[in-house]
């Protein structure tokens, strides 16, 4: 049968595709067929929003043009017939005019690495197309489906709030009495100049937006016909009528129905499922009908329309009729981002039959009715406990389809609630969901009907029938509560090895949810003055019934203005926007995978181990060779040079004979396209002989599996210190690992040049020189034949310092073997599986202290999980030991470090580099000292704090010790003591919600601890027109390094920044570079740039003297005509660096950065949920080179630390397989995760004489300040435990990091947790283990 032509529009241009493949996504088509690379691939599963576009179509059923955001990575092109697509390139450009959305995110400093920026721009643009004057709440809701790993979200929201009708930010101008900077503080604030000026923004003019394609509008009355698209493996049929759909299902009952592709797309990509025939019913009318018993929705109705319809119903119907609707709306509020809700259908959510569905428990509890049809039959069934007979199964026969669902009106005396608990509120998969309904006999509190339905408690949605049936005719009181809780605890049990783990937490949630429902109904009954044997609501319990509400935003950014008289062209100290921000916002900025494909380019896909430790018995590529476009398979046998690689020469480019982790690279397939490469890699068959594996730190300790050497720092007399101590506390702390989650995954393009072994590499790496060295070693050629080029990265955070070479060595080998350009960009799941992350740590400590709280002795044994190679683990452990004191002077101290060798992918550098782990351990035992002494934690911390001139435990003298200033300023500006009293009062008045405060300092050493890395070079070219091309050894990954280097050169040369340009970092301009890491890149590269500029200035000096009134261009031209070189190099090495572990002497650091943060949180003791109310930060960055960039780094680091300490959790199976391989299972902070009040102040008048222009490093030091959130949570848990008779140990308790909802809930011991204690059966393997 002949395939139809696919017709759609992209940015106003008509696209006719004669060979539409149903497996091709819109993202792939945009990037590879149309060359529109602004839309990014971040995850491939609709979880990050980097691929967001706007889709527009004429909706025949609503009789209007509709605009909605969508994930291009999930949208099949076949679903876009007669749809208009708008990408970031279609709304504005630096070459013409930026759209106001693009301009505002750029000028408000909302783009750092920029990889997420186009998607965020398109989410905001879509909102404005639908609502030109949105509310602040609508703006925040628009970004539920978008992630950013760099900015900390504040500048994005603050910039876009200028569009809001109810809260445009004045930018801190001080002209608005209601300014967020003037709210909720009595502390005197010296207003800074604003980071941006909203008055400079181009106004939004909705009349100037592109029109909907007239050709598509003319088709609105044309009858639709069935369409058929044929791909390599899949046929797509677009049904135009219900009868067509029924006939198609009758002909092929196994044909898969697809609407939004939000579930099927995931199954095809990540579960390797194939559906040869896909039928799309999206054109079939999806009527919304208001009937006598409820509102009926067609099964294809998008969830966004369901949400809008129910919101209208709640606003217009009597309150007693809308109880169920409110429950559905509460679930939809957190269901997913706009991109998913706009395309996902209500019927698809039901038929998917997910055991953790947000909506199915609600529909089941409400008694929703489903209309099911097939050819010649039609039936209506109630969605009850029988509808899901097994895992992912429904009662529908293969030939049947779901036609509609009717959500009922609630009745008088009927109450309904819906609940969900996940790791993160926005766009997260639930741990447990629930729908609960009760109907009372008229005028009484006697139960007539009770439905308690749950997701996440079985392999399907379940109804607690045994429990609920026993409550009929009982009264709504304390006795019923106890009976239901006891019944649920027995009926909804989970095996210790249940998939998803968190068994006690999930079981407890079933009771907690019912208790919330009980209180909510009790409250409503009380309002109605029903006293018929009804329980009474304790006022301290009332807050447990409140739904989550985020407080209005209040953000402050304070910094020191440049001195009066500073030249206007001197941009040092000014909040200059990131130089590439506008290009990033318009999609014009080029990242590695954005480079256009070469004519004969090939694609590579890695083949990795599925065993943690095993011998390789055989590799069979025969099936892979059958995949269309297959070229070759490469392995260790193809390496012409050395297969040995890695920082410690303990790795292999490709595993040979044996694998040592799941994800170990065995080989790679090379094909003509990315899709074919993926299929071919999956077809490679490897057989193994398993060997014993070591997965966890505890395993490694038990089996003495360590890398050498054991590290130790010791000072004072530990024996004497402990003997003199009044108290001694011992314990341990576990700190989980963290995934980098840079939005741009690892990417390499290798281009063989055809001469003398030359190879040109485009790589997303922080380490150009090591990449060059490793590739040269692998190919067996000198380093001078390998050119490595880096334009920019979409984030790095340490993850691209060494681990980028796992891709950048495989790709050039394929290019060498084939003689053709080869490209590889890892999928998100590959990247997370292969490249490692932050090291998990286990610390065992013993601390001795006096009754006054003064610590006199400390012993800490540190263990890190390094994985299967050493990589940078030794340096990371060294830094952990250097930071084991944090900010405290401990006279007698010993720290040891053991690096565990395990069968996990090698862990590596991550922002902070071991420092955060060392400091969190310090603050943990410090908090236990305070609790034991019965003293305020802030008093104990201050009492033990270093003073100016003190020596650290590694004998480095503290000079320029600004920490006390930071501490006092933070105490004052945060109103710590007053707010602590307010929190105590809140806790007295609320039983199930508790607040906590904490103030935490940080001291972070600045330098590579490997001395020779503290060097940098720069190259400056001055052209005859006066323009300057600047190159240095650092790479740009969003931290603003290139921007700061231009500012440094601008001041040094005394010319405007507009005359200076940085193109890229490359090994043929600046050789032998150090990695862009350790927060020192501005220090060392800035000084090298300065030195190069000074050389240029000295050469120009004679011409300036001859022509003092001349211009820069005049002097440059004169020098050129006099044959004076206008090119200069600069070089810098940090002086007086070097430390000996043997003698505990020398200086590992050039200087220290300091900061203090105070945070307040509120926890829900029943669910473990928490919200970050407020954070105040005071940070010493010296004399800031760029306050906007520095504040952005402070906020971004803090929010990344917030993820580390409260949210991000890696789950491994006992066999060493990573469960969390994407944004659906691994949660980083989202827009709603940040503190409602976020106040950052850069310490004034604190120049640093040891760095360029008196500045200080800023990238890593602020991250640890997020520990203030962790300890604020712990403070709130203490308040919960103190008031609960079920808790035996009130204040000393174990809280490992991260403080997830599971850990928070389990720590808030109460009558519900007591009912849900689950033993561990020896025969059961847990779903996940703590590595």
Curated annotation (Swiss-Prot):
Annotated [2Fe-2S] cluster 2 binding sites: 113, 116, 148, 150
Entry PTM: Subject to partial proteolysis; this alters the enzyme from the dehydrogenase form (D) to the oxidase form (O).
Residues reported to bind substrate: 801, 879, 913, 1009
Gene3D superfamilies per UniProt: 3.10.20.30, 3.30.465.10, [2Fe-2S]-binding domain, Aldehyde oxidase/xanthine dehydrogenase, a/b hammerhead, Aldehyde oxidase/xanthine dehydrogenase, molybdopterin binding domain, CO dehydrogenase flavoprotein, C-terminal domain, Uridine Diphospho-n-acetylenolpyruvylglucosamine Reductase, domain 2
Origin superkingdom: Eukaryota
Class of the enzyme per the UniProt entry, highest EC level: oxidoreductase
Sequence positions that bind Mo-molybdopterin: 766, 797, 911, 1078
Matching InterPro entries: 2Fe-2S-bd, 2Fe-2S-bd_dom_sf, 2Fe-2S_ferredoxin-like_sf, 2Fe-2S_ferredoxin-type, 2Fe2S_fd_BS, Ald_Oxase/Xan_DH_a/b, Ald_Oxase/Xan_DH_a/b_sf, Ald_Oxase/xanthine_DH-like
Cofactor descriptive note: Binds 1 Mo-molybdopterin (Mo-MPT) cofactor per subunit.
Keyword RNA-binding on entry: no
Residues at the catalytic site: 1260 (proton acceptor)
Binding-site positions, FAD: 257-264, 335, 345-349, 358, 402, 420
Domain FAD-binding PCMH-type: 229-412
SUPFAM superfamilies given in the database record: 2Fe-2S ferredoxin-like (SSF54292), CO dehydrogenase flavoprotein C-terminal domain-like (SSF55447), CO dehydrogenase ISP C-domain like (SSF47741), CO dehydrogenase molybdoprotein N-domain-like (SSF54665), FAD-binding/transporter-associated domain-like (SSF56176), Molybdenum cofactor-binding domain (SSF56003)
Cofactor section: FAD; Mo-molybdopterin; [2Fe-2S] cluster
Catalyzed reactions: xanthine + NAD(+) + H2O = urate + NADH + H(+); hypoxanthine + NAD(+) + H2O = xanthine + NADH + H(+); xanthine + O2 + H2O = urate + H2O2
Binding site for [2Fe-2S] cluster 1: 43, 48, 51, 73
UniProt main location, coarse: cytoplasm
Complex formation: Homodimer. Interacts with BTN1A1.
Similarity comment text for this entry: Belongs to the xanthine dehydrogenase family.
Record's protein name: Xanthine dehydrogenase/oxidase
Gene behind this protein: XDH
